[in-house]
């Protein structure tokens, strides 16, 4: 059995995409979607065994469940009375235009307890737990994030957190091993500007002081900043002119999780993350990419140590 990565993704989504097939005809595609789904997909592609934990229910859940079954992942889903969330994207113009959304209703207290216990049990069987946000963001009580991280770490499982505040703040209380966030999420955490390099460095230190073992701050097309208590790096992936950035961060997290689960150190893991994010960009896909392409791009990812 490959090393396991548990992915906490409270609300997997049904994604519907409209694309132009020809001059007078369209294509409509349905696929499993959401941050956790995309993380799990890349983790599986890079040789890990993902365990996806989340809710499923309602009419859209009936459509979504067989699509989730196509993932190379173990599913540990909790039934809920609420329908799974759905979005519709129109790509006929060449751009990704969101035209409709219908998010899930908040789960009950008992359903939340069921998902929490299922996730902790899975995490204790795994090398890594990834904690992702749900849609809507306020669907769960915030303390669940810190409790998941604390219980997983107490059992010897590494933890990766990809959340916006205030969920991020609660996860930090649990002592997360690795925090991945964008510079705008860092700005939310700081309640201050996080666009200038010095502000980002100072903000990353604040995240470490709040309980993280390592923090990565992505900055769109600029190099990402990675910081631990004693080292700081810039991650510079290859740049390409044509592609789509949606899902690149989730591909990066999936690769990070797979690498850490397989025993790689932080430096190797973040380089794998950079290569996976670049691969996702080339494919216009959310959490997609082949292991061969990621491996081919890996030598082109630069990790440069800088002053903290």
Could you say what each language-model-derived stretch is?
Residues 1-22:
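Positively charged, low-complexity intrinsically disordered leader regions
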Residues 19-39:
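Short catalytic helix/loop segments, enriched in acidic residues and glycine
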Residues 22, 26, 45-128, 296-308:
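Conserved N-terminal subdomain of the carbohydrate kinase-like
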Residues 40-49, 258-263:
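Alpha-helix C-terminal capping segments
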Residues 41, 86-90, 223-226:
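Short beta-strand scaffold segments in enzyme catalytic cores
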Residues 99-100, 126-134, 162, 180-183:
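Short beta-strands and strand-loop turn motifs
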Residues 143-232:
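Conserved phosphate/ATP/ADP-binding segment of small-molecule kinases
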Residues 169, 197-308:
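Conserved phosphate-binding/catalytic region of the ribokinase-like
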């Amino acid at each position: 059995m490959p090393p396991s990565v548990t992915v906490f993704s409270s609300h997997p989504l049904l994604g519907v995409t409209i694309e132009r097939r020809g001059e007078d005809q369209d294509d409509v595609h349905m696929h499993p979607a959401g941050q956790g789904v995309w993380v799990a997909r890349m983790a599986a592609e890079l040789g890990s065994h993902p365990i996806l934990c989340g809710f499923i229910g309602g009419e859209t859940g009936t459509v979504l469940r067989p699509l989730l079954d196509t993932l190379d992942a173990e599913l540990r889903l909790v039934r809920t009375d609420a329908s799974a969330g759905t979005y519709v994207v129109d790509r006929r113009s060449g751009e990704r235009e969101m035209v409709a959304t219908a998010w899930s209703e908040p789960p009950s207290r008992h359903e939340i307890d069921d998902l929490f216990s299922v996730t902790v049990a899975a995490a204790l069987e795994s090398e890594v737990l990834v904690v992702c946000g749900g849609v809507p963001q306020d669907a769960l009580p915030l303390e669940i994030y810190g409790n998941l991280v604390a219980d997983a770490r107490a059992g010897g499982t590494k933890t990766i957190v990809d959340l916006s505040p205030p969920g991020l703040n609660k996860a930090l209380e649990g002592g997360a091993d690795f925090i991945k966030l964008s510079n705008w999420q860092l700005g939310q955490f700081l309640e201050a500007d996080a666009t200038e390099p010095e502000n980002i460095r100072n903000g990353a230190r604040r995240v470490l002081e709040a309980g993280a073992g390592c923090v990565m701050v992505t900055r769109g097309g600029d190099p990402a900043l990675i910081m631990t208590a004693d080292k700081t790096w810039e991650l510079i992936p290859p740049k390409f002119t044509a592609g789509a950035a949606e899902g690149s961060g989730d591909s990066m997290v999936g690769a990070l999780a797979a690498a850490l689960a397989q025993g790689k150190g932080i430096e190797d893991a973040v380089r794998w993350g950079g290569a996976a994010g670049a691969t996702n960009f080339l494919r216009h896909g959310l959490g997609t990419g082949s292991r061969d392409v990621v491996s081919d791009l890996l030598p082109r990812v630069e990790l440069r140590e800088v002053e903290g």
